[in-house]
Amino acid sequence: DTLVAQEKTTSLNQVVNTLKERISLAGYAQLGYTYDDAVKPDNTFDIKRIIFMAHGKITKRWTCDFMYDFYNGGMLLEVYTDYQFLPGLTARIGEFKVPYTIENELSPTTVELINCYSQSVCYLAGVSGSDKCYGMTSGRDIGMMLHGKLFHDFLQYKVAVMNGQGLNTKDKNSQKDVVGNLMVYPLEWL
């Protein structure tokens, strides 16, 4: 009986250790204060976002990611899977940030301001909902992307085929958006 109990404990420990190695959980919340000096000011503390993230390593080449915003009723932000075919060639399928502009792909945690995107990025990438035709997409869409880094990370590319409808929205037509970017990093610190 003691030997069987030890084997069960060892087996359970192996499962727990494997899960710890393969699954990482993270999250953050951002709070702010809005000051308005208008005739009728609307000064207020507010919550900007409450984010939960999970990253799973299925195999050495295959991963999956999940991101959810609990603020204001909750909203699925990202859910996708990556598969690395070769060094420098990875395919992604799911809902993720559109590879359009440098700012759109930055996390709000890496930018100094809570409302962190320029007006042009908010409009063109659909981050803020300022484009009434495109709506509020949070800079995300559903689709497929090929991406990678080449020449010792000197060159980074991303090419995506997206629905073009935005966040959590099924395609409403048979047309797709083709989006991409090409980044050159001539110096390590740039």
Feature annotation, model-predicted:
Residues 1-10:
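Cleavable N-terminal export/targeting peptides
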Residues 15-167, 172-179, 183-190:
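Outer membrane beta-barrel
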